[in-house]
From Swiss-Prot:
<feature type="binding site">
    <location>
        <position position="379"/>
    </location>
    <ligand>
        <name>ATP</name>
    </ligand>
</feature>
<dbReference type="GO" id="GO:0003677">
    <property type="term" value="F:DNA binding"/>
</dbReference>
<dbReference type="InterPro" id="IPR044125">
    <property type="entry name" value="Adenylation_DNA_ligase_IV"/>
</dbReference>
<keyword id="KW-0233">DNA recombination</keyword>
<dbReference type="GO" id="GO:0005524">
    <property type="term" value="F:ATP binding"/>
</dbReference>
<feature type="binding site">
    <location>
        <position position="313"/>
    </location>
    <ligand>
        <name>ATP</name>
    </ligand>
</feature>
<dbReference type="InterPro" id="IPR000977">
    <property type="entry name" value="DNA_ligase_ATP-dep"/>
</dbReference>
<feature type="binding site">
    <location>
        <position position="480"/>
    </location>
    <ligand>
        <name>Mg(2+) 2</name>
    </ligand>
</feature>
<feature type="binding site">
    <location>
        <position position="502"/>
    </location>
    <ligand>
        <name>ATP</name>
    </ligand>
</feature>
<dbReference type="GO" id="GO:0006310">
    <property type="term" value="P:DNA recombination"/>
</dbReference>
<dbReference type="InterPro" id="IPR029710">
    <property type="entry name" value="LIG4"/>
</dbReference>
<dbReference type="Pfam" id="PF04675">
    <property type="entry name" value="DNA_ligase_A_N"/>
</dbReference>
<feature type="binding site">
    <location>
        <position position="480"/>
    </location>
    <ligand>
        <name>ATP</name>
    </ligand>
</feature>
<dbReference type="GO" id="GO:0003910">
    <property type="term" value="F:DNA ligase (ATP) activity"/>
</dbReference>
<keyword id="KW-0460">Magnesium</keyword>
<dbReference type="Pfam" id="PF04679">
    <property type="entry name" value="DNA_ligase_A_C"/>
</dbReference>
<dbReference type="Pfam" id="PF01068">
    <property type="entry name" value="DNA_ligase_A_M"/>
</dbReference>
């Protein structure tokens, strides 16, 4: 029988002491090949099945055939059968299997340090292949353009290895290695770092496995399984509390060993943070509301309506664990983890005397007497002692490594841990205590170490008016933003809640929050960008509702194409992370499992190559605004998208989803109507259509357009109607037919307008009853055309919540005085609806009714230019349009009487490329304030203070950049992200 000899560097005796009640398997683990024969291959086969609604299933019973399962049900059935078999034939300890099924979640096994190229090199030596042969070249150079595309297994390194191994296998039948034996050998492999130590381990696998087993082994080593099911599905089927426990511990071992019996639920006390176990922290909610509404959403206590205002730090979210341990010099052991559960203890130190620790060696006096153990939540930032100011996030790791080499430098950049919460103190979890109580415990436990470990400060707010001065300060200091916190709230693990809210300043010409989109396609460039991918197709992942209906969780809708804002290093970085994973786009066999384009068979914006979302990268993209587009599957895209940065801390699962974007868009539109200072946003419940004027009734959202599938059947639900006459236009319907139509769509029919409250009167011609209602003048009379328009619009919006379109003047047979003005606001000056798709006939009449304008004023010309630029992508590539729509203000140094030569050259260059130049800083249209690269810090600070006054005026804030932004953008032939060119002060 297999025995667990070593897990995560611990002996079996140590594990027995740590987990005395862990389950023991009664029999040997299953053969390794059973993993792919009974689990991986069936799951992959299920991925290839066409998806469809679960409703289209055969019925069970004496007259029904065998039930046809939906792909999602079949996926669960495959996993359930494997788990049931394991429990029956092996035992309750499924940890050995889960380590190989979801290896990317196994934190107990060290990283192998083996990437594709290294494995290819080792296989060439093990199989004694000539490195210059076709197979040798393909293994060693699999990333080279053209090589991977020639293979049937293109983009799949493990599949490439399978092809090569299949030509020279030692075994053709499956081997007899068990799952536990494979785990034992992988533990040995993880403990090695030299080639001469790695080769014997891989040679043993080669001798005892056939090509298919080796292919799956390589996928396990690379942690790239692609089995058509996420860890969430495995966790849900294993135990109902498995995902919750993993969220608070990030420990696959705890999930398997503490939750082996599905009938024994996790106790509340067990679902708490634990020392030296990485948890998933609480996150701040994005909101786009006016300040009073944000405070309202925090649901502050009437007895204590105060809230806290903290500066949002530009660093990395880190949790610090400290406990007493006599085996560590100094008696205290430390652990550091990121939000994504990456262990950074090696970087910041495991004890007071860790010579490699960039932080812990400075913390000997950081804790109050009596603190034996503690868990702190905070932000690790980079601090520059010379400027006595924080530096951008991208410099953090460099600063930490520099601190390791020279720990007592007084001038070098260093990591600084700013603490804003405490979760655990002296064996007691504090998550259920209020933030105010936790802060008291934090301040009593920590003795700050200047510019090494500090408690993050906060301001107390009593009303919305207290937020604005703090936001002005943030702008003046070029900080990230603010976080508002409810001091009476508990700590909510792995949750994003209104108790904490982000507030970011909204800058000119940008659409609120950055969009983190997964790359799904690529387009080859021309000219100076020829020979490589120059622009990328980004998508939005589908939501849970579509997954439940059978869609692949990885499926993405095409959303935007971005080719601006990239520098040569940016392209190189993306290439590094995606080389070898691209596949040629085959129009006859599009990858519909992963990507859905607009246009059906026409395949609008079809990329040259595509990539699986789980092998791709996430780009942070900024844009000017959202605009309708039939070229992208979402029905929407963004104007002037620009690359901001590569989000290596995110993957396809955490990239923006369709619903998340629609929520973001709805919030942006709602706040656009308010005359208050606006902030960045993210999540709400319902997305609304972009409109020209404020609406009182929600309109139609083109972004979620669905094909015609008939009336939704609920559009008039909860409404009362009194149909008085038949219909003549646009359809001839009798009174009875109109009543049937209303009832079929959820409405109720009455034969008088006084029988039920809020009854709508429907009529199109004058009768005695119509005249009677009209004479009383208490009820408006609506034409039947409104019924038809509502039903038709909801057919177009199939799949969205049913919404009524607002009344238009054309819908009204008679309007009471109190409603006339409101209804008139639902159309523009030409009677074009803001919320409804008009028909071609209506559009034709509308155009005829418009007066001719022989001479267009400048604003109209500018608007036309913008529309041309939006529709013609080639205009964006013209250097003469590079700074179009940008308004720049150039600031001379206080010691100069006129602009310096570099500033004048930059100004001329920007104007040549389409920019406008504003002479006064007070100009409301300014998008960028440009200064010289050698401006003095005092001048920069003064300028930021002046710009911050825009906050009080409720205006957006211009970017503050050096002339390098203009120069480098001109060289790159693309507008680059402004944050890279912000001056330091």
């Amino acid at each position: 029988m297999d025995r667990l000899n070593n897990v995560g560097g611990e002996t079996e005796r140590e594990l027995d002491e740590k987990y005395p009640n862990r389950p023991r398997n009664k029999h040997s683990t299953l053969p390794f090949h059973d993993l792919f024969l009974t689990l991986f291959n069936p799951l992959n086969g299920n991925k290839k099945r066409p998806t469809g609604p679960a409703a289209a299933r055969k019925k069970l019973g004496p007259h029904g055939g065998q039930q046809t399962l939906s792909p999602q049900e079949l996926r669960r059935d495959i996993i359930q059968r494997f788990i049931s078999r394991w429990r029956k034939e092996v035992g309750n300890d499924i940890y050995p299997a889960f380590r190989l099924i979801i290896p990317e979640k196994d934190r107990d096994r060290a990283m192998y340090g083996l990437k594709e190229k290294t494995i290819g090199k080792l296989l060439v030596k093990i199989m004694k292949i000539d490195k210059n042969s076709e197979d040798g070249f393909n293994l060693l150079n699999w990333k080279l353009p053209g090589q991977s595309m020639a293979s049937r297994m293109a983009g799949d390194f493990a599949g490439r290895c399978y092809e090569v191994i299949s030509k020279r296998p030692i075994r053709t039948d499956v081997g007899n290695m068990t799952i536990q034996e494979v785990n034992d050998k992988l533990d040995v492999l993880a403990a090695t770092s030299k080639e001469d130590e790695q080769i014997p381990v891989l040679e043993e696998f080669y001798r005892n496995m056939n090509p298919e087993e080796l292919m799956w082994l390589i996928r396990i080593i690379l942690r790239q399984m692609k089995v058509g099911a996420t860890e969430r599905t495995f966790f849900e089927i294993w135990h109902p509390d498995a995902e919750s426990l993993f969220s608070i511990s990030s420990s696959l071992r705890r999930v398997c060993w503490e939750l082996y019996d599905p009938n024994v639920r996790l106790e509340a006390d067990e679902a708490r943070v634990t020392l030296m176990q990485c948890f998933q922290p609480q996150l701040a909610q994005f909101q786009m509301h006016s300040f009073p509404k944000m405070i309202e959403r925090m649901r502050l206590s009437p007895d204590d309506p105060t809230f806290w205002i903290e500066e949002k730090l530009d660093g990395e979210r880190i949790q610090l664990h400290m406990m007493s341990d006599d085996s560590i010099p100094g008696g205290k052991r430390f652990g550091f983890w990121s939000r994504k559960a990456k262990d950074y203890t090696y970087l910041y130190g495991n004890g007071f005397y860790d010579e490699n620790g960039a932080l812990t060696r400075h913390l000997k006096d950081a804790f109050a007497d009596g603190v034996d153990n503690i868990i702190l939540d905070g932000e690790m930032i980079t601090w520059d002692p010379e400027q006595d100011a924080p530096l951008p996030f991208g410099t953090l790791k460099t600063a930490a490594l520099s601190e390791q080499r020279n720990p007592f430098s007084a001038t070098g950049q260093r990591p600084l841990f700013r603490i804003f919460d405490i979760l655990y103190l002296n064996d007691k979890a504090l998550t259920r205590y209020t933030l105010r109580d936790r802060r008291r415990a934090l301040e009593a436990s920590i003795k700050p170490v200047h510019r090494r470990l500090e408690v993050h400060t906060y301001e107390i707010g009593n009303s919305a008016a207290d937020i604005e001065p703090q936001l002005r300060k943030v702008v003046a200091e070029a900080s990230e933003g603010l976080v508002l916190k409810n001091p009476n709230s508990p700590y909510r693990l792995n949750d994003r809640h209104d108790d904490w809210m982000k507030v970011k300043p909204e800058y000119m010409t940008e659409f609120g929050e950055s969009l983190d989109c997964v790359v799904i396609g690529g387009y080859y460039g021309s000219g100076k960008r020829g020979g490589g991918l120059a622009s990328f197709l980004c998508g939005l992942r589908v939501d849970e509702a579509q997954v439940r209906q059978g869609a692949s969780p990885m499926k993405c809708y095409s959303f935007l194409k971005v080719g601006g804002g990239f520098t040569a290093p940016d392209y190189a970085n993306i290439r590094h992370h995606t080389d070898g994973k691209w596949k040629d786009w085959n129009p006859k066999k599009p990858p519909t499992e992963f990507i859905e384009l607009a246009g059906g068979d026409a395949q609008y914006e079809r990329p040259d190559v595509w990539i699986r979302p789980d092998e791709s990268v996430v780009l942070c993209v900024k844009a000017a605004s959202v605009t309708p587009s039939d070229q992208f599957r979402l029905g929407l895209t963004v104007r002037f998208p620009r690359f901001k940065r590569l989000r290596m801390d995110k993957d396809w699962k955490s990239a923006l989803s369709i619903q998340e974007f629609m929520d973001l868009k709805a919030n942006a539109e709602r706040e656009q109507k308010e005359k208050e200072f606006k902030i960045d946003n993210s999540r709400r419940k319902r997305a609304k259509r972009a409109v020209k004027k404020p609406l009182t009734i929600a309109g139609y959202d083109e972004s979620k357009r669905a094909g015609f599938t008939g009336p939704s059947g609920h559009v008039f639900e909860g409404m009362n109607f009194f149909v008085i006459t038949d219909s003549v236009e646009p359809e001839k319907k009798s009174k009875l037919e109109l009543e049937q139509l209303i009832k079929a769509n959820g409405g109720k029919i009455y034969q008088t307008h006084t029988a039920a409250p809020n009854t709508l009167c429907i009529a199109e011609r004058r009768t005695v009853k119509v005249a009677s209602v009209q004479k009383v003048a208490k009820e408006s009379i609506i034409r039947p055309s409104w019924l038809f328009d509502c039903i038709k619009q909801n057919e177009v919006d199939k799949g969205l919540p049913d919404l009524l379109i607002p009344f238009e003047p054309r819908h009204m047979y008679f309007t009471v005085k109190s409603q006339e003005e409101e209804i008139a606001r639902h159309v523009d000056e030409y009677s074009d609806s803001y919320a409804r798709d008009i028909t071609p006939n209506e559009l034709s009449k509308l155009l005829v009714s418009m007066p001719l304008i022989p001479n267009l004023p400048p604003p109209h010309i500018s608007k036309t230019e913008t529309q041309i630029q939006e529709r013609e992508s080639t205009f964006q590539e013209l250097r003469g349009w590079l700074f179009k729509n940008q308004v720049l203000h150039f600031v001379k140094r206080r010691s100069d009487s006129m602009l310096s030569l570099p500033l004048r050259l930059a100004s001329n260059l920007a104007r040549f490329a389409g920019a406008s130049v504003a002479n006064e800083l007070e100009d409301k249209s300014i998008t960028h304030v440009v200064i010289d690269t050698d401006s003095q810090p005092a001048d920069v600070s003064a300028l930021r203070s002046a710009i911050s006054k825009r906050v009080a005026a409720g205006r957006r804030i211009p970017h503050l950049v050096t002339i390098a932004w203009i120069q480098d953008s001109w060289k790159a032939e693309s507008l680059l992200d402004e944050e890279r060119f912000a001056p330091t002060a």
